[in-house]
Structures are given as structure tokens and as C-alpha cells.
Amino acid sequence: MIQTQSMLDVADNSGARRVMCIKVLGGSHRRYAGIGDIIKVTVKEAIPRGKVKKGQVMTAVVVRTKHGVRRTDGSIIRFDGNAAVLLNSKQEPIGTRIFGPVTRELRTEKFMKIVSLAPEVL
């Protein structure tokens, strides 16, 4: 469950290392974002010569959460940390590689590119 002020790791090679959620998109008073939800983030930590710079406001999709996601069979998939993938204005990933596992819940029409780049799909 990601909310405003939540810090997330970046799971791609866009150049950002840590981002902070500044808005959960999808409703006027929506408080929490889960896996597969789109959020507005600001870059808090970035590497030199990356595609994004510190202080930039970006759109991102949540790919891993500590809270996890419940499957229809009753199992819960949880991760050790919260992570997101940065998106451009066309909702496509900025980076060309994805680090770490992602869940099957991202297998929608919008995020198939992220699933195909990921090394492992749970």
C-alpha cells in the first residue's frame, strides 16, 4: 500500500534510484496505491548521466509492495520492499531493463512491455 510521502526503489535503468510518491492517481480522494496502480513521483536520488534528474516529477507504476497482493486462490505475494517503474507520457517504461521480479497482475494491455522485460514473473 503506497500513499503520499512513501519512498520507493526504482526497478529500472532510467537513472533514478529512489522516488517519493506525491499523488495516487485514479480518483479525487484516493489514498492507497497497490501493485499495477499509477502514481505521481518525484526523483529523490539519481545517478549521474541518467535519463532522469533529481527533482523531476514523473509518472510511475507500482511493481512491488511490502503489503503484497492477494490472489484468487487465497495466496498472498509479498516483497521485501516497495518498487516502481518510471513511465513516460505515453505510459511506456523509460528504462530498457527491469530489475527484480514483478507479479502476474501487471499482465494487462498497458504494462505488457514491463512484464516482457522483467527477469521473473511471479
Curated annotation (Swiss-Prot):
One Gene Ontology molecular-function label: large ribosomal subunit rRNA binding
Pfam families: Ribosomal_L14
Keywords: Ribonucleoprotein, Ribosomal protein, RNA-binding, rRNA-binding
GO cellular component, one term: cytosolic large ribosomal subunit
GO biological process, one term: translation
Annotated SMART domains: Ribosomal_L14
Gene3D superfamilies: Ribosomal protein L14
Keyword Chaperone: no
Subunit structure: Part of the 50S ribosomal subunit. Forms a cluster with proteins L3 and L19. In the 70S ribosome, L14 and L19 interact and together make contacts with the 16S rRNA in bridges B5 and B8.
PANTHER family found in the cross-reference section: 50S/60S RIBOSOMAL PROTEIN L14/L23, LARGE RIBOSOMAL SUBUNIT PROTEIN UL14M
HAMAP family membership: Ribosomal_uL14 (MF_01367)
Function text: Binds to 23S rRNA. Forms part of two intersubunit bridges in the 70S ribosome.
Entry-linked NCBIfam families: rplN_bact (TIGR01067)
Family: Belongs to the universal ribosomal protein uL14 family.
Record's protein name: Large ribosomal subunit protein uL14
Organism listed in the record: Pseudomonas paraeruginosa (strain DSM 24068 / PA7)
Lineage of source species: Bacteria, Pseudomonadati, Pseudomonadota, Gammaproteobacteria, Pseudomonadales
Gene name of the record: rplN
